[in-house]
Amino acid sequence: MRQMWNGWLLALQLFTVIPIRRSIEWNDIHVRWLVRSMPLAGAAIGALAAGTYALCSMFSFGTPLFLALFLLWLGIWLAGGLHADGWMDVSDAFFSYRDAKRRQQIMSDSRVGAFAVLSLACLLSFRWLFLYETIKAEIPPALFVAIPLLSRSGAAWLLSVGKLAKSTGMAASVREYISWRDAVWALVLAFLALSLLLVFGGVPVWTSAALAVAMALLALGAKPWVEKQFGGVTGDVLGALIEGGETLLWGVVWLLHSSAMG
């Protein structure tokens, strides 16, 4: 139990700005539980966003326009901008139309290109639109937990089973300690957490099923694509999957509500 707890704290230290004032040893069991806890780290970010949304709704504070923008940036800030940076690096690399080796070098470059800026603006514009429309429809706060939970589940799976692009970097430093079994653990924990949201959070069964299927299809499709385009998985690729996954899932929520109302 202590090792599980340490892995969870390590996931929060690595993937969020939540202050964890504790030094945790980087070893095999802690890293395995870090990967297994990735969905729960997403759920922690989502819980803070859900609490903010619930309080604002309870006290009628802010318009849907304001809440959509505020909650959009709150999620990015709570993740430390780490995944947004990955999205930008992957965009720059992909739109260079170079070979996989050169794309890896571009992702390692700290400079920001035009395609990085344009793609991030496109990503966040659509996410803001989906948030705005769904907040107007008075969605349950638990959806703010479910979506980052599922996006990190896909990333944990890809990190555990995907081919590595290189032998250095964040993904490689984690991968040496883990296997496909850790992806199974992460998915089981995500399923249990999602089940709790179904029972206690008011998330409809069909909505949960649609979100889970959409994220599974995205992750399954991402694996061969990133191996072809970038030579494999990197930390930036995982960040891009998380950010792209969240926008996709909010789009699914928007489509479901639009269909129900239309």
From Swiss-Prot:
Give a yes or no for keyword Iron in this entry: no
Q: Which GO terms describe its molecular function?
A: adenosylcobinamide-GDP ribazoletransferase activity; cobalamin 5'-phosphate synthase activity
One Gene Ontology cellular component annotation held by this UniProt entry: plasma membrane
Reactions listed under catalytic activity? alpha-ribazole + adenosylcob(III)inamide-GDP = adenosylcob(III)alamin + GMP + H(+); alpha-ribazole 5'-phosphate + adenosylcob(III)inamide-GDP = adenosylcob(III)alamin 5'-phosphate + GMP + H(+)
Q: Where are the transmembrane segments?
A: 37-57, 58-78, 112-132, 139-159, 183-203, 205-225, 237-257
> Which UniProt keywords are present, listed alphabetically?
Cell membrane, Cobalamin biosynthesis, Magnesium, Membrane, Transferase, Transmembrane, Transmembrane helix
Q: Name one Pfam family in it.
A: CobS
Q: Which InterPro entries match?
A: CobS
Q: What class of enzyme is it?
A: transferase
Q: Which GO terms describe its biological process?
A: cobalamin biosynthetic process
Its needed co-factors are: Mg(2+)
Q: List the disulfide bonds.
A: none
Its Enzyme Commission number(s) read 2.7.8.26
**Pathway(s) per entry:** Cofactor biosynthesis; adenosylcobalamin biosynthesis; adenosylcobalamin from cob(II)yrinate a,c-diamide: step 7/7
- Tell me if Cell membrane is a UniProt keyword of this record: yes
Membrane topology per the entry is: Multi-pass membrane protein
Q: Where in the cell is it found?
A: Cell membrane
Major location category of this protein: membrane
Write out the similarity annotation: Belongs to the CobS family.
Stated role: Joins adenosylcobinamide-GDP and alpha-ribazole to generate adenosylcobalamin (Ado-cobalamin). Also synthesizes adenosylcobalamin 5'-phosphate from adenosylcobinamide-GDP and alpha-ribazole 5'-phosphate.
> What's the protein name?
Adenosylcobinamide-GDP ribazoletransferase
Source species of the chain: Geobacillus thermodenitrificans (strain NG80-2)
